[in-house]
């Protein structure tokens, strides 16, 4: 299933956290037409391994980007949650650490219309991305 190119054209740039990996998920999303930057591309190989979540969250908000990640604890961690709230970050999380890269990418691709609708609004927010829906959790 190929995503709607008009929706992709209107979607803000996406930052892909290291929790999604640096190769497979980003490549699958790029192949589908998503415009994105990985943590490794933005920070460099060495620094990408140690950048704290609150720093990349703040950076995405400052850049006006959307964050894609797989760390469901961000909404529960006090510092990270506060960063989302204070910066107006817009995050979309696949809340399962045990699924394959193809399944992760498929969720984002299948949810493109819902993600695009949600991303039209200012943050702060976190949505979880499920096989057939997204759910606002913050």
From Swiss-Prot:
GO terms for molecular function: nuclease activity. The keyword Hydrolase applies. Keywords: Hydrolase, Nuclease, Toxin-antitoxin system. It comes from the Bacteria. Its EC number is 3.1.-.-. Toxic component of a type II toxin-antitoxin (TA) system. An RNase. The cognate antitoxin is VapB45. This is Putative ribonuclease VapC45. It comes from Mycobacterium tuberculosis (strain ATCC 25618 / H37Rv). The lineage of its organism: Bacteria, Bacillati, Actinomycetota, Actinomycetes, Mycobacteriales.
């Amino acid at each position: 299933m190929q995503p709607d190119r008009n929706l992709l054209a209107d979607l803000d740039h996406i930052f892909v956290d290291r929790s999604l990996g640096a190769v497979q998920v980003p490549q699958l999303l790029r192949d589908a037409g998503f415009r994105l930057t990985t943590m490794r591309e933005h920070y460099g190989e060495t620094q990408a391994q140690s950048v704290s979540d609150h720093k990349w969250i703040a950076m995405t908000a400052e850049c006006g980007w959307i964050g894609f990640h797989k760390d469901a604890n961000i909404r529960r961690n006090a510092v990270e949650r506060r960063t989302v709230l204070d910066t107006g970050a817009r995050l979309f999380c696949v809340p399962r650490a045990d699924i394959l890269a193809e399944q992760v990418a498929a969720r984002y691709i299948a949810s493109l219309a819902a993600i695009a609708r949600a991303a039209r609004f200012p943050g702060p927010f976190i949505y979880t991305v499920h096989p057939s829906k997204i759910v606002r959790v913050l």
